[in-house]
Amino acid sequence: MLKTCRGFSLFMNWFNGICAVVCGGWMMLSALVDLPLSWNDWMPLSIYDPFPFHDVFFTSHFWPGLALLLVNGVSNVVALVLRRKGEAEWHRACLVAGILLLCWTITELLIIPNGMSLFYFVLGILQTAAAAVLMKNAVRRTA
């Protein structure tokens, strides 16, 4: 069980760290320059219409891309870096990354429900649960 939790946590750190940084960066770049394959080709800006302040923060994909990069990308990259510092720091960072993913996807599911957000919501539950199991085991070992 612990090996599975460690493996899944590590997978999520790499997967979300890479995907959120790449996709967030692509979204931001698509807002700034004309790309041959732009984020605008995948997702129209009208998808943001249900969000509060959509006419301020969602006039391009820049701010959503920056938020994705910072919230989901950086939190998982930090967790990967902290893995070298020690298990306790890594477990806490994995828990924070999982909770942030849950908050992100819950917001998306409430405002713009879609299958991809549901998929990431399940991943967020699993990431948070895996980190909680690892933290509980670490506390048990030190007690």
Feature-to-residue mapping (PLM):
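Topology signature of small-to-medium multi-pass alpha-helical membrane proteins
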Residues: 1-143
